[in-house]
A protein has these predicted regions:
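Conserved class I S-adenosyl-L-methionine
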Residues: 108-123
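Class I SAM-dependent methyltransferase SAM/SAH-binding core
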Residues: 31-68
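A short glycine-rich, Lys/Arg-flanked "PGG" loop and its adjoining helix->strand segment in the class I
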Residues: 94-107
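Conserved alpha-helix/loop element of class I SAM-dependent methyltransferases that forms part
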Residues: 1-15
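A short SAM/SAH-binding and catalytic strip from SAM-dependent methyltransferases
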Residues: 79-91
Length: 123
């Protein structure tokens, strides 16, 4: 599991409800479900990732965060996670506003494009 996911999981209390936006293959969701008894849901844009998640028994729907977050009822989750995807949105401010409507707490991570391990690939 990615180090980042371990850090995120430490911020989330046991027995809570979490929406993972851009959940990818569901690795973090599965960990939270198995290790912290978290009720997880996912929103993912990739059909292949949605299929992969559902084959693991995870509750994931296909959707675009910029268009579909408003469909979730206000404060329907304790936490919402947006990991490593904020930079891909056309309107990140709207996405953040929508995240904060869906949950009491938002955990947002972004890539560190200045880190040497990232920059070394440019040379």
């Amino acid at each position: 599991m990615k180090k980042e996911f371990k850090i995120i999981s430490e911020l989330i209390a046991n027995n809570t409800r979490v929406l993972d936006v851009g959940c990818g293959d569901g690795t973090l969701m599965k960990y939270l479900k198995d290790e912290k008894n978290v009720d997880t849901r996912g929103l993912e844009i990739s059909k292949n990732n949605v299929r992969n998640c559902t084959s693991k028994g995870l509750s994931v729907i296909e959707g675009n965060a910029e268009k579909d977050l408003h469909q979730f009822p206000n404060l329907s989750f304790d936490y919402v996670i947006l990991s490593q995807t904020l930079q891909a949105f056309y309107n990140p401010e709207k996405v953040i506003d929508d995240l904060l409507k869906v949950a009491n707490k938002a955990i947002v991570t972004i890539p560190n494009f200045g880190h040497w391990k990232v920059r070394i690939h440019y040379f």
